[in-house]
Design a protein with these regions (language model features):
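N-terminal helix-rich module
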Residues: 1-2, 9, 13-39, 43, ...
Length: 170
């Protein structure tokens, strides 16, 4: 009886730590997933010798992300995407289906009017449109996925609250 009670107390003490670890891993996974999609879009742009973009669109309280290629040589544009001139090359995925309780912001979360859509484009020579995507987990962990336009390089950063600094993790 004593052993069962002790095991119950120990289990109750470790569950919150496990939950925090799961949420942090989920948020980190979401950041790495987006970094991977961005790197893949860049490689597709180079391979196709055409602009390729990831399109982010608000879908309720989450975002979808889809990949489009330039179909007429003028870059990937929302108007061309809607009429099929710029073809869909990877169907839209709801981020909340893959990473529940992870919140994506297309602009700095402190902005008073957050962005609800964005195109992150990559050119055939590997350059990109610069942007930072912000992710926040249910445990408060924060990650950023940053693309440097001149090189198309994608980096994943984690916010360390104790030092108030973003630290590169990938």
């Amino acid at each position: 009886m004593f052993a069962v009670a002790t095991a119950g107390v120990l289990a109750a003490a470790t569950v919150p730590q496990l939950t925090t670890g799961v949420e942090r891993a989920r948020t980190s996974g979401a950041a790495r997933y987006l970094a991977g999609r961005l790197a893949f879009a860049r490689s597709q742009a180079v391979a196709r010798s055409a602009n390729v973009a990831l399109a982010f669109a608000a879908d309720g309280n989450t975002f979808t992300v889809a990949m489009y290629a330039d179909g007429n040589g003028n870059g990937v544009r929302t108007a061309d995407m809607s009429v099929g001139v710029d073809p869909l090359i990877e169907k839209a995925v709801r981020l909340s289906d893959l990473f529940p309780r992870v919140v994506l912001s297309l602009s700095d979360p402190s902005d008073t009017s957050p962005a609800t859509s964005a195109l992150m484009s990559f050119s055939p020579i590997g350059t990109a449109s610069s942007r930072t995507l912000y992710l926040r987990g249910a445990d408060g962990s924060q990650y950023a996925v940053r693309v440097l336009g001149a090189t198309g390089r994608t980096r994943v950063l984690r916010y360390v609250a104790s030092t108030r600094a973003w630290v590169e993790v990938l």
